[in-house]
């Protein structure tokens, strides 16, 4: 049953710069989870450090504001403890592609049922506009004293190589389309990435709204491109075209669902195979004490090594 988006709005004051793409992303999240009818008690938003991390304060749920780059491992623990929760990671390109890059890759390899929303503005907005991992080489934004000399990371291509089974790209100012992408990502069974391009009006004076609008287009309007993998055999056939589309970034930037593998089993399904009953009785629902005493008492582990006076 659909809910009102107001059911997910907290009383916290939203602290972002005027015109920030984060507003569009937040509104898209509100509407996506409300149209999916997700109870706030069954929603967990995990964020890292950066402007994007504040999302955890603005959406009602069992949320967690993690350390820099550590949103994905925290979300992994949340999801494994209670696989019935809808877990969303909200992180910036610096947080998830920089210090958190290793965790980003690990999530794809596991294919755990978590949705990653990558707030991608190519700068570190919270710390005065340094170059983030997604800023192309030789671009000089107004906060930089000289052009960026690092090559940029391509988040969607990295996700494809790591094993994510749903990869999409949206634009923060196109809230209707972004809402639909988030809904599909949350419904997907497995690791999902939505790379959300957004202007940073305060620090990125190059990749502005005008810059993006001149380049972005939606792949579903392009005849002949089918990103959906329905059988294992289809992957071998479609992988080259999908990889080429994921590499496309410059004069033309594709938006929409770029890759969707519906054949690979999720990490939870694999756990169920080696731990029968995991899904029906996950760790979060199991008793941790009996008659006031814990099931596992640490003294029992070390009783043969205890030194008594």
Curated annotation (Swiss-Prot):
Entry's cofactor comment: Binds 1 [4Fe-4S] cluster per subunit.
Q: What is its EC number?
A: 1.2.7.11
Q: List the InterPro entries hit by this protein, alphabetically.
A: 2-oxoacid:Fd_oxidored_beta, 2-oxoacid:Fd_oxidoreductase, OFOB, PFO_beta_C, THDP-binding, TPP_enzyme_TPP-bd
Query: Which amino acids does the record list as binding Mg(2+)?
Result: 93, 121, 123
Q: What class of enzyme is it?
A: oxidoreductase
Activity-pH dependence? Optimum pH is 8.5.
Q: A Pfam family name for this chain?
A: TPP_enzyme_C
What is annotated about its quaternary structure and interactions? Heterodimer composed of an alpha and a beta subunit.
Name of the protein in question: 2-oxoacid:ferredoxin oxidoreductase 2, subunit beta
Q: Which organism is it from?
A: Aeropyrum pernix (strain ATCC 700893 / DSM 11879 / JCM 9820 / NBRC 100138 / K1)
